From Swiss-Prot:
Enzyme Commission number(s) of this protein: 1.1.1.1
Protein name: Alcohol dehydrogenase 1
Organism encoding this protein: Gadus morhua subsp. callarias (Baltic cod)
A single GO cellular-component term on record: cytosol
S-S bridge residues: none
Cofactor note: Binds 2 Zn(2+) ions per subunit.
Lineage: Eukaryota, Metazoa, Chordata, Craniata, Vertebrata
One Pfam assignment: ADH_N
Binding site for Zn(2+) 2: 98, 101, 104, 112
Length: 375
């Protein structure tokens, strides 16, 4: 009944930075050429949503509907869409996979150039957004906007998933869990029998721990200032736990002493340039690999050149190195086959109306993942 019509639905709108989100009725346009309109069933709340709201530089990125870790059902498709049918289960992707650009054609990267990100760093341009509220254009965040009952996404930024997948759980594969798991498996390429350190035990860090464990690491050192996170890290395979506040010497020295000179692989899952440096310097010279996973663009990152000259490698990872259309369905299948944990990340469930409570929980480190229901 909704096909071909503008849909009025509920969404959480961020009218300006540093203010609570407001539940509004918005209008969601029909999908244009090559676009898909998706009924969002559930969405996680990710730290990157908070980053845009509270810390990001992009003050012109408002009003906006945040959310980029969602799952839903195809409601309708625009002209030229052949890959998707109404009723199919999908996960919208904040990194597209057009399949045609030189990045998509290379196995080395997932950095597709066809997506929204070439217009601006974090929101769709006003001409691309399909949302309006109270007569104003409302921007779409990371090309997705899952804090809305309906959203419109280009078909190159949608992954089709197993019809048996529970949407209120696999939504986490739209960002956090895939990001951390893939950083270990795809980017760091953690080796069996290796020693790893993971800095920051939010959902991304815990997923990185799970990735290290899945890759066969024999020792996984979990590092966090909040010791409450250590029990959870154990569930995902961590073997050792370090709280930097318990030590007077730098954390890199603590880890170096624990591991006979340094770890083989480290993953920074915080988004703090000081921690990034510590993660690199915790690696063993000669072959240690450190991966930046946590997101920030507010400061420069630095280290002494000898750290790299001595054979360490510094890498970055976005969305776990997964090409979305290929990787997300595989991760969903891995979950259904019980090879990847998801339920253990979910500490809270609430309706969309409680989105500000979910944001507060994350801001104060009181949750791993909160899943919002949009039904």
């Amino acid at each position: 009944a909704t096909v071909g019509k503008v849909i009025k639905c509920k969404a959480a709108v961020a009218w300006e930075a540093n203010k609570p989100l407001v539940i509004e009725e918005i209008e969601v346009d029909v999908p244009h050429a090559n676009e898909i309109r998706i009924k969002i069933i559930a969405t996680g709340v990710c730290h990157t949503d908070l980053y845009h709201l509270f810390e990001g530089k992009h003050k012109d990125g408002f009003p906006v509907v945040l959310g980029h870790e969602g799952a839903g059902i195809v409601e309708s498709v625009g002209p030229g869409v052949t890959e998707f049918q109404p009723g199919e289960k999908v996960i919208p992707l904040f990194i597209s996979q057009c399949g045609e650009c030189r990045f998509c054609q290379s196995p080395k990267t997932n950095q597709c150039v066809k997506g929204w990100a070439n217009e601006s760093p974090d929101v769709m341009s006003p001409k691309e957004t399909r949302f309006t509220c109270k007569g104003r254009k409302v921007l779409q965040f990371l090309g997705t906007s899952t804090f809305s009952q309906y959203t419109v996404v280009n078909q190159i930024a949608v992954a089709k998933i197993d019809p048996s997948a529970p949407l209120d759980t696999v939504c986490l594969l739209g960002c956090g869990v895939s990001t951390g798991f893939g950083a270990a498996v795809n980017t760091a390429k953690v080796e069996p029998g290796s020693t790893c350190a993971v800095f920051g035990l939010g959902a991304v860090g815990l997923a990185a721990v799970m990735g290290c464990h899945s890759a066969g690491a024999k020792r996984i050192i979990a590092v966090d200032l909040n010791p409450d996170k250590f029990e959870k890290a154990k569930v995902f395979g961590a073997t050792d736990f370090v709280n930097p506040n318990d030590h007077s010497e730098p954390i890199s020295q603590v880890l170096s002493k624990m591991t006979n000179g340094g770890v083989d692989f480290s993953l920074e899952c915080v988004g703090n340039v000081g921690v990034m440096r510590n993660a690199l310097e915790s690696c063993l010279k000669g072959w240690g690999v450190s991966v930046l996973v946590g997101w920030t663009d507010l400061h420069d990152v630095a280290t002494r050149p000898i750290q790299l000259i001595a054979g360490r490698t510094w890498k970055g990872s976005m969305f776990g190195g997964f090409k979305g259309k290929d990787g997300v369905p595989k991760m969903v299948k891995a979950y259904l086959d019980k090879k990847v944990k998801l339920d253990e990340f979910i500490t809270h469930r609430m309706p969309l109306e409680s989105v500000n409570d979910a944001i507060d929980l994350m801001k104060h480190g009181k949750c791993i993942r909160t899943v919002l229901s949009l039904e």
